Amino acid sequence: IRYEPIGVCGLITPWNFPLNQIVLKVIPALAAGCTMILKPSEIAPISGVLFAEMIDEAGFPPGVFNLVNGNGEVVGNHISGHPDIDMVSFTGSTRAGKLIQKNAAETIKKVTLELGGKGGNIVFADSYPNAVRDGVRHIMSNSGQSCDAPTRMLVERPIYERAVKEAVDEANKIKVDVASKKGDHIGPLVSKIQYDKVINLINAGIKEGATLAAGGPELPDELNKGYFVKPTIFTDVNNNM
């Protein structure tokens, strides 16, 4: 058995954990002896630039690691369809992943995709006592922008009322403030597009008849601008919403 480098790898990373995702893709490729082209998210590019500077300072030969900034429609499509790139690794939305897979098929390159998706957080009556509170904190960490955030909580009926009270109490404890301040709080969403998407979903939940138990579409107290969203919880939700 021989292990050989794949060759040139196109690495496309998301905005929600920029440096983490860069490291997870670049280091294994380097260790395997591959060369690579990294395209970080266009709305979170600074981590990629800093990482490129570290690679340069570490003394890697020119051409082993290459950084290209730009949007997905232009740079991402070029990477996924380029005949001289042997593999593309993408983390991001399912919509973009479909486009990358179709584009890569033209050159029969290897593709790895880690795509968005939300699974329900299931809490049974005999679950450990802090399951609901821990679940809410998990959802709200990173300002709710984690790809594995369990944004739906499915609770067994005998503990439903208690679970609602605990979830609302925990959400109301979470402070929202500017990221530059020290302290135990969450910051704003990453962009206007993401902010508008979340606010539209909150308004849709209200319009479709779910009970707004915490939070809402208004800016948090003492914040009069920015992409800040209150930790929001709906109850009485059904699968048709």
Model-inferred region functions:
Residues M87, R95-N239:
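ALDH superfamily catalytic-core signature
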Residues I1-N130:
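Rossmann-like NAD(P) dinucleotide-binding subdomain of oxidoreductase/dehydrogenase enzymes
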